[in-house]
């Protein structure tokens, strides 16, 4: 009798100066339940634990001058070495780099895991980014104080795509940005609220008409583009 090969748990490794930020909202709702059920695992490392001096120094002033401080490559390299057992791509959250989107989330969901580095200060020494072959990934054209919020957003979008996390595959297929379209508006009880009624077609029971109206909304352009 053959025993089934145990399923590899999708694992996220996070290197951060603020480990208490995790799991944060990832420990709640759908992602939190999936974490409790062992569908995915989270390993968080405090970058400061890998400092090379007794003062736990993790940053230094940039060569060439300029404002702010830069995360040291030696400290971050030691951190990444300690998390080398986590499989998958290495990603540095940064205002520059590839824009994270739904297609990217799907890519990561098909990986065995991912390691995320949460930047702080003025950024990370470029040498460790290159030496560790990290991908630089951005959530958009804006600046956050650090990469922790970006890391949580990236993981939330990815974890919900893992098998067994969302109960309805149809629900995933119909979400916004699948096939490049936006999700249609949703309505629930009460039927009339503050003088506003649910569209009559949704009350008709005619599934063909409902599908047609839904598709019309799907094809409307997003104002965020």
Model-derived features: positions:
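Short, solvent-exposed amphipathic alpha-helical segments in soluble enzyme
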Residues: 29-34, 106-110, 131-132
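A short acidic, often aromatic-flanked loop/helix-cap motif at beta-alpha or helix-coil junctions
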Residues: 48-53, 98, 143-146
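Conserved small/polar residues in nucleotide/adenosyl-binding loops
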Residues: 216-222
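Structured adenosyl-cofactor binding patch, chiefly the S-adenosyl-L-methionine
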Residues: 124, 128-177
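Hydrophobic/aromatic beta-strand patches that form the interior of the parallel beta-sheet core
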Residues: 13-15, 43-45, 89-91, 114-115, ...
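N-terminal nucleotide/polyanion-binding subdomain common to many enzyme families
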Residues: 2-83, 203, 208-211, 218
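Surface-exposed, charge/polar-rich loops and edge strands
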Residues: 160-200, 212
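S-adenosyl-L-methionine/SAH cofactor-binding core of RNA-modifying enzymes
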Residues: 71-120, 125-126
């Amino acid at each position: 009798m053959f025993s089934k090969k145990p399923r590899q748990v999708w694992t996220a490794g996070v290197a951060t100066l603020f480990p208490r930020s995790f799991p944060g909202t990832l420990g709640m709702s759908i992602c939190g339940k999936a974490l409790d059920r062992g569908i995915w695992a989270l390993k968080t490392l405090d970058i400061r634990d890998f400092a090379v001096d007794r003062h736990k120094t993790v940053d230094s002033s940039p060569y060439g001058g300029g404002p702010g401080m830069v995360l040291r490559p030696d400290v971050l390299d030691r951190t990444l070495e300690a998390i080398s057992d986590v499989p998958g791509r290495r990603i540095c959250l940064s205002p520059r780099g590839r824009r994270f989107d739904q297609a990217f989330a799907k890519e990561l969901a098909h990986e065995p895991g991912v390691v995320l580095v949460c930047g702080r200060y003025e950024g990370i020494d470029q040498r460790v980014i290159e030496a560790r072959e990290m991908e630089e990934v951005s959530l958009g054209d804006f600046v956050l104080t650090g990469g922790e919020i970006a890391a949580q957003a990236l993981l939330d979008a990815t974890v919900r795509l893992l098998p067994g996390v969302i109960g309805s595959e149809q629900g995933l297929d119909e979400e916004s940005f699948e096939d490049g379209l936006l999700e249609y508006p949703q309505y629930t009880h009460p039927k009339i609220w503050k003088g506003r009624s649910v569209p009559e077609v949704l009350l008709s029971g005619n599934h063909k008409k409902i599908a047609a109206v839904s598709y019309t909304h799907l094809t409307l352009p997003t104002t965020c583009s």
